[in-house]
C-alpha cells in the first residue's frame, strides 16, 4: 500500500498536470459517448488520441500496450501502434541552456559545433548531431525540461486509478493491473536516467567482447559529455538493415549480414538473458565498414534461464506442429505453475496454434503480408487468455520476444528466403 499513499503526494506542478490530464480524458469521454450514441465503439481511438495529446508518460504507456499483445486486447494493441511519439521540437536556445547547465561552462567549451535543427524530437528527449572538441562526430540526446516532474505526476495518477480499478471493478481484483503499472513506473523512470542507458550500451558491448564478436558494434559512450539528463554517443553512419538496396553499398552479401545480426542478437539472449528489446529497422544498421550497428538502448529486456528454456521448447513445438510441446514451453516459462493439466492445456491451444501455424507457413511461402499486426496481436492475446484459464501466468517478455522473432522472420524472408528462422533457430546460437 506504500505506493498507493505515495501516489497522493503531489506538488502544485503535479496538481496542474493532473487537472490537465483529467480535462483531456473528460473531453475524449464526451466524444466517446457521442460515438456510442451513433453506434460506434471508438474507445481505443479516443484513448490513443488522449495519449498523444498528453504526451510523455501516456505515449510511453501507449507504446507499452502496443508492444505487449499477450497482455492487452487486439483492438487496443493495434490502435496504440499508431501512437506517434513526435512532438514539437524544443527551441535550440533551451537545448543549449540545458547542456551548459549539465556539463558546466559554455557549449563551446565541450563541442566545436552543435546542429541547431534536431535529428529527432520525441516526448522524453531530443537528439542533435554535434562535433566534439577532438573533431569526433557525435549525437547528443537531451531530456526535455521538467520531464521528470511531469512523469512523476502522470505515474502517480495512473497508479492511483489502477488501484481503484482493482478495488472496485468486478473481475479485476486478481488482474495484476496495479503490479503492471508499478513495473511500468520503474521501467520509465529508468528510461529517463541516461546513466542507465549508457550502462545498457556498455553491458551489450561487454557481451560482444566476451564472445570475441567483431561483426557488430554499439556506439561509444562519451561519459565525460554525459549526465543523467544528457547522453553523448558516437554517431553511426550507414543504412537500416532492411533496406537491401542501400546496404549493398556497405556489404557485398546482405544475406550474410542479416544472418550475422540475428546470430548476435540470439546469442546475447541465450548467453546472459540480456537483450535489446526494441530492435527494428531504425535501431539496426549496416555501418560503412560493413559491421552491424545496434543503437538506442533505452529499452532492454532480461529473461531468466527458465524463460529461455521455455521459449526454445515453445519454438520447437511451433516448428514441429506439436501442441503438447507448445504447452510444455509455456508451462516452463511460469515459475509459479503448479498442478496444470498439460493434456487439457495442449488441447485448448489447438485452435490458436493452427492460426499461428497458418501465419508462419504463409510467411515461409513468401506471403509477407500475412504477418499482419492485427492478426498476430489477436493470436498472442489468445495464447495469454488460454494460459490464464489453465492457471498460468505468461511472462510479459514472452509476447515481446515472439513478436520480435516473427518480425525477424519476415526480414529473413525478404533477404534470405532459404532460411527458416524458427526451424533453424539453433544455428543462430554461438
Locations of regions flagged by a protein language model:
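N-terminal accessory/targeting segments that precede structured cores
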Residues: 1-126, 149-177, 412, 419-420, ...
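Helix-rich C-lobe and terminal helical cap/extension of kinase-like folds
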Residues: 12-15, 39-41, 236-257, 287-430
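Short hinge/gating elements
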Residues: 39-47, 68, 79-86, 141-147, ...
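ATP-dependent phospho-/nucleotidyl transfer catalytic cores
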Residues: 74, 81-88, 100, 152-153, ...
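Glycine-rich ATP phosphate-binding loop
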Residues: 129, 136-144
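Conserved beta3 strand of the Hanks-type protein kinase catalytic N-lobe
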Residues: 130-131, 279
